[in-house]
């Protein structure tokens, strides 16, 4: 019996780039050899850009965006995804720009206690309105294959 799915949770975290490349190559070989899908759980947007076909972005244990990898990097819709991508150093921009990285303001929500209504990102979101604190946005398809959980769409 061969698996249909391999779940790899942070397989490249804290590895140097050489070992990271070897791990990713091994995962791709397994995928091709066994004809299985890989669910890659990572915070490394570079790894995502290089290896993923679809991306699911989560914030505070809630899915906030799902899209094909190219579309997500080209046009992220959720304010958290936008902030996440703006906070990544870029070599092509850093050499010619004095623009600083933009950290996401605020702190990560606690997941202790009962789940509260509202968008979990609302306390950190510059675009949040009162309704965002009281209602949880549904994940809805706003373009073919691109879903977002945000009342702005």
Task: Give, region by region, the residue ranges found by the protein language model.
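P-loop NTP-binding/switch modules centered on Walker-like glycine-rich loops
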Residues: 2-3, 7-11, 15-97
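Charged, flexible cofactor/metal-binding loops and thiol motifs
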Residues: 68-153
